[in-house]
């Protein structure tokens, strides 16, 4: 149990630090759709797709690795709450087009990146 908790905690800390860094460095570049938040969600989508494909092909790997990468790192990196707050802020400002664009970009982009992660990992593994 402690190994699982440690794996999740370590992964979450690393993911959250990366998300914080991306926001710090990028969000001021385009405040309407903060690129740090978007990049965190897109990278997280790719990583989780690649990880799912990899772990499906390597069932003998210790489950703590899956917890570290998928539950911890991707959970700490991706951010539905920040994305939601940014969209609500746009709606409150009456910027409906920007809000719709942010929703479309985050959701479709994250789904496409997850698929890309799955396909690219399967390709690298020769599957």
Swiss-Prot record:
The keyword Cytoplasm does not apply. It holds the Pfam family CRCB. It comes from the Bacteria. It is found in: Cell inner membrane. It is a multi-pass membrane protein. One of its GO terms (cellular component) is plasma membrane. GO terms for biological process: cellular detoxification of fluoride; fluoride transmembrane transport. Keywords: Cell inner membrane, Cell membrane, Ion channel, Ion transport, Membrane, Metal-binding, Sodium, Transmembrane, Transmembrane helix, Transport. GO terms for molecular function: fluoride channel activity; fluoride transmembrane transporter activity; metal ion binding. Na(+) is not transported, but it plays an essential structural role and its presence is essential for fluoride channel function. It catalyses: fluoride(in) = fluoride(out). The chain crosses the membrane at residues 4-24, 36-56, 68-88, 99-119. Na(+) binds at residues 75, 78. NCBIfam families: crcB, PRK14196.1. Fluoride-specific ion channel. Important for reducing fluoride concentration in the cell, thus reducing its toxicity. This is Fluoride-specific ion channel FluC. It comes from Pseudomonas aeruginosa (strain ATCC 15692 / DSM 22644 / CIP 104116 / JCM 14847 / LMG 12228 / 1C / PRS 101 / PAO1). The lineage of its organism: Bacteria, Pseudomonadati, Pseudomonadota, Gammaproteobacteria, Pseudomonadales. The gene is fluC.
């Amino acid at each position: 149990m402690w190994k699982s908790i440690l794996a999740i905690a370590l992964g979450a800390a690393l993911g959250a630090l990366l998300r914080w860094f991306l926001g710090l460095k990028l969000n001021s570049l385009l405040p309407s759709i903060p690129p740090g938040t978007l990049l965190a969600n897109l990278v997280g989508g790719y990583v989780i797709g690649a990880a799912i494909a990899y772990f499906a092909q390597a069932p003998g790997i210790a489950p703590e690795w899956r917890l570290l990468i998928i539950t911890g790192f991707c959970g700490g990196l991706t951010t539905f709450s920040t994305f939601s707050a940014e969209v609500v802020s746009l709606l409150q400002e009456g910027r409906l087009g920007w809000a719709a664009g942010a929703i479309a970009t985050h959701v479709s982009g994250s789904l496409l990146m997850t698929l890309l992660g799955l396909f690219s990992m399967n390709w690298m593994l020769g599957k």
